[in-house]
Design a protein with these regions (language model features):
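Extracellular carbohydrate recognition and processing domains
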Residues: 120-150
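Short beta-strands within extracellular/lumenal beta-sheet-rich domains
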Residues: 69-91
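Extracellular beta-strand elements of beta-rich domains used
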Residues: 140, 173-175
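A short beta-strand element within beta-rich, extracytoplasmic domains
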Residues: 83-107
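Short, surface-exposed beta-strand/strand-loop-strand elements in extracellular ectodomains
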Residues: 105-124
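Structural recognition of the beta-strand scaffold that forms the well-ordered cores
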Residues: 8-11
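Short beta-strand-plus-loop segments that form exposed binding edges in beta-rich domains
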Residues: 155-167
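Extracellular carbohydrate-recognition regions
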Residues: 13-51, 181-201
């Protein structure tokens, strides 16, 4: 379905890369990664509502990182100088990494938000329909990246569009699948069995 152009949301992590880098407009746990805005004819502004924030390495019941932060907005242009948001990661090791973007769907969202991924193999561009899919991770593709932090390894978002006057939103980028971030409790039954086993020894 993806090869045919469909947007497929998979609840299970698709990437076997154990490293994970999250870059967000509200800050990064990896302080060497960076979110940068470049303003031209239109200015980036704070969005109304809640966005993503990477506040902790693990999450428990009822904690939703997509409701704990903010996001940025900008009006699209058809002509003139574009404004760019950049997510610049520090890659821990050479390898293949899945790239995901997060944004918020708002009234008059753009249907062709232009993302560009700079990677080891060159440059790949994607037009994302932000009228849908806000508040989650949207998969762009898997790419090779070299270790370190440089301008040849980043994700950008432009406000250039086929339609002027729409809204593009910028929030977070995730690179790599990681090891999971849901803190799982030990079941009472399992804990009881372990105690019984230890009593017999």
């Amino acid at each position: 379905l993806e090869n045919a152009g469909a947007n497929v949301l998979i609840p299970r992590e698709r990437d076997c890369q154990t490293a994970e880098i999250i870059i967000d407009n509200d800050g990064c746990l990896n302080t060497r990664s960076a979110y940068v805005e470049n303003t031209a004819d239109k200015a980036w502004m704070q969005g109304n509502g809640k966005g993503f924030a990477h506040l902790r390495s693990q999450y428990t019941d009822f904690e939703n990182p997509f409701k704990e932060g903010t996001f940025r907005t900008i009006e699209t242009i058809k002509k003139g100088k574009e404004s760019i948001a950049e997510w610049i990661p520090e890659i821990p090791q050479n390898g293949q990494y899945a790239v995901y973007v997060s944004y918020q769907t708002v009234p008059n969202s753009s249907d062709d938000a232009l993302y560009t991924v700079y990677h080891k193999g060159g440059i790949s561009q994607f037009k994302v329909n932000q009228k849908m899919g806000g508040g989650t991770w949207i998969y762009l593709g898997t790419f090779g990246f070299d270790a370190g932090k440089n301008n040849t390894c980043k994700v950008t978002l432009s406000n250039r569009s086929a339609k002027a006057g729409q809204i593009v939103t910028a929030d977070a980028v995730k690179i790599g699948g990681g090891m999971g971030n849901i803190a799982r409790r030990i079941s009472e039954e399992g804990a009881t069995d372990n105690l019984k086993s230890s009593d017999k020894t």
